[in-house]
Regions:
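Redox- and metal-dependent alpha/beta enzyme cores, enriched for Fe-S-associated oxidoreductases
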Residues: 47-61, 68-69, 243, 247-320
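C-terminal hydrophobic structural anchor segments
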Residues: 306-352
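Acidic/His-rich segments in extracytoplasmic proteins that coordinate ligands and/or metal ions
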Residues: 85-152
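Peripheral docking tails and interdomain loops at the edges
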Residues: 3, 343-383
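A charged, amphipathic alpha-helical module
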Residues: 2-34, 147, 151-279
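Glycine-rich, highly charged phosphate/nucleotide-binding loops
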Residues: 76-92, 303-317
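Structural motif
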Residues: 35, 100-101, 326
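Metallocofactor- and cofactor-centric catalytic cores in central/energy metabolism, strongly enriched
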Residues: 8-9, 15-29, 33, 37-41, ...
């Protein structure tokens, strides 16, 4: 695809990628290409990719199916879990409907129990994530889980995964990570060249671009164009620079970003799952492939592991590189691990970097938009 001269039009294309991807998925199914659905960045996409499958992020960012989910699940459960289950149960997510296999993971107790019910209407493989990532036993367990996933994928799709195919998938996925990282590193420029809303459109929309080569080329061209325009003086006005951390990006993050940027701030970076957490580190392309995969995915700084030094290290790196003025921690209601860890994040940000921090607990509804705007406006005014 040739680069459109109007950059906002490109950002909107990425924003619409999820809806447009529905037709692409139907075409993939008609061509007999397997589809693997996933909910988490801990899932090693390289393994199903090596079997010729396409990996898709499943719909779990809106509240429209939560009422149906609550017929089976507790009301006081994380909205991400209820939304994930609801979209699957109601067949309102075409990506879930067309998935031949869903790969889950034990990142939290609510999720792993939800997968038991999901398995009643969709083939589900659950990866057992170790609670700690600091010892050899945890690494051995996670490597074994990689091999168990390989076996499941091979049996499910009747396609043996060769080492060469896996190395090719690793190399391709690494190129995608680097292209995404180069794009969101644009937020390090000061003043920023684009808004956090536009960054979010591209980073989230990229998960629904299934032609990896085309995606990489488009990201590279767009990044070069934005950087060139910034060097020519096309920059946003100086404002307080905000880093978002916390729960996975989705409907909740979108309204938080909107509140920040409508009240005088710019979101310049995302530490969340769809942002730096997933793409900043690549898989080693030498040595044992499963050791390399285990090492990369165990390095993800998620609140479900303890201790979670990786998250603190990533935050410190981003606070410095993005010249951050304040940190906003987005916590989904009833997400206990991120809620409990918020104290450690607050201490780290304030004591190690001497910058303001605010924790925002929210869900996928719009009921708190007014209150959210008021709190965010007061926070930014303080900056």
């Amino acid at each position: 695809m040739s680069l459109i001269t109007d950059l906002p039009a490109i950002f909107d294309q990425f924003s619409e990628a999820r809806q447009k991807g529905f037709l692409t998925v139907m075409d993939l199914k008609e061509r007999g290409i397997p589809l693997v659905g996933t909910y988490c960045t801990f899932m090693p996409q390289e393994i199903p990719m090596a079997a010729g499958a396409v990996v898709v992020s499943l719909c779990s960012t809106a509240d429209e199916t939560i009422e149906e989910a609550e017929k089976d699940l507790p009301r006081n459960l994380c909205p991400l879990i209820k939304s994930s289950y609801g979209f699957g149960k109601t067949d309102k997510c075409p990506y879930f409907y067309f998935s031949d296999l869903v790969v889950g993971e034990t990142t939290c107790d609510g999720k792993k129990k939800m997968y038991e019910y999901m398995a009643e209407f969709k083939p589900v493989h659950v990866m057992q994530l170790p609670n700690s990532v600091k010892d050899d036993a945890s690494r051995a367990l996670w490597k074994a889980e990689m091999l168990r996933l390989q076996k499941t994928v091979e049996e499910r799709f009747g396609h043996e995964i060769s080492e060469d195919a896996l190395r090719d998938a690793i190399a391709l996925k690494n190129r995608e990570r680097r292209a995404l990282a180069n794009f969101y590193h644009l937020g390090q420029l000061n003043p920023p060249p684009l808004s956090g809303s536009d960054i979010l459109k591209v980073v989230y929309g990229a998960t629904f671009r299934f032609d990896k080569e085309a995606l990489i080329n488009e990201l590279d061209a767009m990044t070069a164009r934005v950087r060139q325009q910034w060097e020519e003086g096309q920059r946003l006005d100086p404002r307080p620079r905000i880093l978002i951390t916390g729960c996975p990006i989705g409907g909740a993050a979108e309204k938080v970003v909107r509140a920040i940027e409508e009240n005088g701030g710019w979101v310049v970076g995302y530490e969340n799952c769809t942002g730096a957490k997933a793409t900043e580190q690549c898989v080693a392309e030498t040595g044992d492939v499963y050791d390399a995969l285990a090492d990369k995915y165990l390095a993800i700084g998620c609140s479900c592991v303890s201790p979670n030094d990786q998250r603190l290290q990533m935050l410190s790196q981003m606070v410095e590189e993005y010249q951050v003025d304040g940190v906003v921690d987005v916590i989904l209601q009833a997400c206990h691990t991120y809620a409990v860890e918020s104290l450690a994040i607050k201490r780290h940000v304030r004591q190690q970097h001497n910058i303001p921090y605010i924790a925002i607990e929210t869900d996928y509804s719009t009921s708190d938009v007014g209150q959210l705007s008021t709190r965010v406006a007061a926070f930014i005014e303080m900056l």
